[in-house]
């Protein structure tokens, strides 16, 4: 695992190299996705069934074999052990309660001349959520995508989830049940994204697609953006831990593992002023790694993109963190509130030694769909606001038309747009150009 010090003359260059991630699209993936999307666009259900059978080793005769009813979702819920149902319910309630705080409302006000100005907030009509399936089963992704949409008041939530070899995951289906998903189709990959974006005879066209997926799903989301909205095209998972050197090093090592185990190209970084503590964390990593079921993935991630970085103090750690703009930022320090004003760019900030990132992944309440690859500089977590849209409201009174008409007329003539000017002038009491 790479060890750096901010005092090194070449630190800035080495940090930049560490953060570099090749986001360019793979031409082979692009070509395959373009072909699949075009096929689903033109042939609808037939193409969707064909590609699903091919890629997911299915033998579906038609879309009826790839459609799950609410009764089937409920049955999956009832098959779960009681303690798992309780855990899923508790997580769902916390996620719902948090997102209810984000709900935006319409507003308006009147000028002194009676002109009304405002904003009308409305939910999207229909959204599609993509959930990974098969062995990579993520019920938490169902909750994090469906519940904000539900809170926003979205009219219909469509979920797609691949079931390779016909393998359905009860946890995922149960999460869809308690989150209020309206329709579930057991399809995945680029073909599922295309079906949601363009619609087929069975799959309704949606207004927005959210949720994580592999390179083919990401490429398909890029391709259909503009036809529908998308949440983001996410890169590898990331965690940055700022530690003052007083947290149990085993805790920090395991927190680094928690993201490294996602993917060989996930990123885990520690910033700490103490060289001795960094050595302790390094020892904890060596001690704990052999017991991890996903050891090979963690090792590859830490070796390829991980780092233990010594900084001069916590203030410098915050400066470096703002440059990194991590997906997950842990403040494993005595007084996290003191650091908060110095931090501008992070998807989610986990404050205090007891706040492990994994709690945010499952049940704390805030969304775990977060900006990656330094996009936290300008992007935000998925939320209710992603499932609402805003329309401006303008109702000009007769008196207001006299004042605004003259302003608009002058500006429109200045831009050489005569019809714009005349449309305003005709509403003036004397109807004359100004």
Curated annotation (Swiss-Prot):
Binding positions (Zn(2+)): 259, 262, 361, 420
Give the InterPro entries listed for this entry: Ald_DH/histidinol_DH, Histidinol_DH_CS, Histidinol_DH_monofunct, Hstdl_DH
Gene that specifies this protein: hisD
Descriptive protein name? Histidinol dehydrogenase
Q: Where does NAD(+) bind?
A: 130, 191, 214
Residues of the active site are 327 (proton acceptor), 328 (proton acceptor)
Q: Which NCBIfam families match?
A: hisD
Q: What does this protein do?
A: Catalyzes the sequential NAD-dependent oxidations of L-histidinol to L-histidinaldehyde and then to L-histidine.
Q: Name one GO cellular component term.
A: cytosol
The UniProt entry's GO biological process terms, in alphabetical order, are: L-histidine biosynthetic process
The enzyme's first-digit EC class, named in words, is: oxidoreductase
Which transformation does this protein catalyse, written as a reaction?
L-histidinol + 2 NAD(+) + H2O = L-histidine + 2 NADH + 3 H(+)
List keywords of the entry alphabetically. Amino-acid biosynthesis, Histidine biosynthesis, Metal-binding, NAD, Oxidoreductase, Zinc
Q: In which pathway does it act?
A: Amino-acid biosynthesis; L-histidine biosynthesis; L-histidine from 5-phospho-alpha-D-ribose 1-diphosphate: step 9/9
Q: Please report which protein family the annotation says this sequence is part of.
A: Belongs to the histidinol dehydrogenase family.
């Amino acid at each position: 695992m790479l060890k750096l010090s901010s005092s090194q003359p070449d630190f800035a260059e080495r940090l930049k190299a560490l953060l570099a991630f090749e986001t360019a699209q793979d031409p082979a993936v692009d070509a395959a996705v373009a072909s699949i999307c075009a096929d689903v666009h033109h042939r609808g259900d037939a193409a969707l069934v064909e590609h699903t059978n091919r890629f997911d080793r299915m033998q579906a005769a038609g879309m009826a074999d790839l459609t799950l009813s609410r009764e089937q979702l409920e049955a999956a819920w009832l098959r779960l052990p009681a303690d798992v149902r309780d855990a899923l319910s508790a997580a769902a309630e916390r996620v719902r309660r948090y997102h209810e705080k984000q709900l935006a409302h319409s507003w308006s006000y009147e000028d002194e001349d009676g002109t009304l100005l405002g904003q009308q907030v409305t939910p999207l009509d229909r959204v599609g959520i993509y959930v990974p399936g098969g062995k990579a089963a993520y019920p938490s992704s169902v909750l994090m995508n469906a519940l904000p949409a539900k809170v926003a008041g979205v009219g219909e939530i469509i979920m797609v989830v691949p079931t390779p070899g016909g393998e359905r995951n009860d946890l995922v289906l149960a999460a869809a049940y308690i989150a209020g998903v309206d329709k579930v189709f057991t399809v995945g990959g680029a073909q599922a994204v295309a079906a949601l974006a363009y619609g087929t005879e069975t799959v309704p066209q949606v207004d927005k697609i959210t949720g994580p997926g592999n390179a083919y799903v990401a490429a398909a989301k890029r391709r259909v953006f503009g036809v529908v909205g998308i949440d983001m095209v996410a890169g590898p998972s990331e965690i940055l831990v700022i530690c003052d050197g007083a947290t149990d090093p085993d805790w920090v090592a395991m927190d680094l593992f928690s993201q490294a185990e996602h993917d060989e190209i996930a990123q885990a970084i520690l910033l700490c002023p103490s060289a001795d503590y960094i050595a302790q964390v390094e020892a904890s990593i060596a001690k704990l790694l052999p017991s991890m079921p996903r050891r090979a993935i963690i090792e590859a991630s830490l070796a390829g993109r991980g780092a233990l970085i010594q900084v001069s103090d916590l203030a410098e750690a915050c400066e470096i963190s703002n440059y990194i703009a991590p997906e997950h930022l842990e403040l494993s320090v005595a007084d996290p509130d003191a650091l908060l004003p110095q931090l501008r760019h992070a998807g989610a900030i986990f404050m205090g030694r007891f706040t492990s990132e994994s709690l945010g992944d499952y049940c704390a309440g805030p969304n775990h769909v977060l900006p990656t690859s330094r996009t936290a500089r300008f992007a935000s977590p998925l939320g209710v606001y992603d499932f609402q849209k805003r329309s401006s409201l303008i109702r000009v009174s007769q008196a207001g038309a006299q004042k605004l008409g003259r302003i608009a007329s002058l500006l429109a003539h200045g831009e050489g747009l005569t019809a714009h000017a005349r449309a305003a002038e005709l509403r003036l009491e004397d109807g004359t150009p100004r």
